[in-house]
């Protein structure tokens, strides 16, 4: 009996695509410094009455920046978000910047 399809080596088809990616040479990634929490290192507290400090944690549009961008720890990121919202409520920071 003749087979209609050629024989297939099962070992080559079972290998995952990750194995071939791992064996490929790694591309040069830019080295970045680990971001550290300013509040932990300098023993500071976020305060709604200090809009200049809080402006570092919001975008030009007024959105609160995430932890992965600012480098703050989870505890202080929650505090920053709360203080930004308080500062907006008493009109020290704008909700949205107008042009």
Curated annotation (Swiss-Prot):
Known function: Binds as a heterodimer with protein bS6 to the central domain of the 16S rRNA, where it helps stabilize the platform of the 30S subunit.
Short name of one Pfam family: Ribosomal_S18
A GO molecular-function annotation: structural constituent of ribosome
Any one Gene Ontology cellular component term annotated for this protein: cytosolic small ribosomal subunit
Subunit structure: Part of the 30S ribosomal subunit. Forms a tight heterodimer with protein bS6.
Phosphoprotein in keyword set: no
Keyword RNA-binding in annotation: yes
Family per record: Belongs to the bacterial ribosomal protein bS18 family.
Highest taxon above the source species: Bacteria
Protein name: Small ribosomal subunit protein bS18
Compositionally biased spans, kind Basic and acidic residues: 1-25
Region: Disordered, residue numbers: 1-28
Keywords tagged on the record: Ribonucleoprotein, Ribosomal protein, RNA-binding, rRNA-binding
């Amino acid at each position: 009996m003749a087979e209609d399809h050629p024989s297939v080596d099962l070992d080559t088809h079972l290998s995952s695509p990750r194995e071939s990616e791992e064996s490929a040479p790694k591309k040069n990634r830019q080295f970045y410094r680990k971001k550290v929490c300013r509040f932990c290192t300098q023993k500071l507290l976020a305060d709604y009455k200090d809009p200049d400090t809080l402006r570092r944690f919001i975008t030009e549009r007024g959105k609160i920046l995430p932890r992965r961008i600012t480098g703050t720890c989870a505890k202080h990121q929650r505090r920053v978000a709360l203080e930004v919202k308080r500062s907006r409520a008493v009109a020290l920071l704008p909700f949205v910047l107008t042009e």
